[in-house]
Amino acid sequence: MKIIWTFTLLMIPGVVSSISVTGYSGGGVIITCTYDRKYTDNTKYFCRGQKTFIQTEQCSDLIKTDKKNDNKWVNSGRFSLFDYTRATVFTVTFRDLSEQDSGTYQCAVDISLSEDSYTEVNLKVVTADCCEKSISLSAAAGGSVNISCRYPQSHSADVKFVCRRSGSDLCAEETSVKESRRWSAEGQMQLYDDREQQLLTGIISHVTQQHSAEYWCGVQSDQGHKSFITRVLIRVTDVSETSSPSSSSPSSPSSSSSSAESPLQRMCVRN
């Protein structure tokens, strides 16, 4: 399973705040921390271990920025860091999680001649049986791709989304749905969340070769945590590559359709 969480936290020098994060084996987390504008040019880093006023355990750096390395991705193994200086936030992406990654981490800003500002992140990585870790889909150009992703019941009330990955950014393009049994559309992507069934349905219509990519199904809590649950690999082929005409893919209704009907009840066949 995949996960990826987003945390928005204000770090104050000399003050330790703590959050708990659940990740899924095979997934990842995105941790987003805010900082005071006066620390825009300071080094940002992410480390594993305890960090208290009286350090009894070393916090080993996993990834860090250089000064003036703002608005650029920094990559190191399974980690990526991006410092959005205009918004005074930086994000840490932690991919390909395993249960061995469970532990204590720190999201921090390096402050010279003073206590660094940091937030303790307690990460617990588990394996969930409800959902697939990865699925592969294919469609002919001009057709539609239907995505179905299950999620843990504990996330039923959360916002659901499908993100398209671009390089280090697991969520370069996002379409989300905030209500149960209502379609939400953005561009060629439409989403439908059935919270009773814990099932997220997505439809990408009129696909082209440009839609061949890695996508992620996930959830976002009201605290801003983003959890990437299932990786979806989509391959779009030319019509000439298919051995026989494929059946027409169903399409979703507009987002204004009634919320009482299921996705399949509201789909119509494209001509």
Regions found by a protein language model. Give the residues of each.
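N-terminal Sec-dependent signal peptide, specifically the hydrophobic helical h-region
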Residues: M1-S20, S102, L123, T127-E132, ...
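Solvent-exposed loop/turn motifs of extracellular immunoglobulin-like beta-sandwich domains
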Residues: I3, G23-I30, Y39-D41, T85-V89, ...
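Amphipathic alpha-helical interaction motifs in eukaryotic regulatory proteins
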Residues: T34, C47, R95-S98, A108, ...
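N-terminal V-set
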Residues: R37-S76, S154-E186
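Short, structured motif recognition centered on aromatic/hydrophobic residues
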Residues: F46, S76-F79, F90-F94, I147, ...
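Extended, solvent-exposed segments with strong compositional bias
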Residues: S80-Y84, M189-D194
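Extracellular/luminal immunoglobulin-like beta-sandwich modules
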Residues: S98-Q100, T104-T127, G167, T208-Q210, ...
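Extracellular mucin-like PTS segments
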Residues: T237-N271
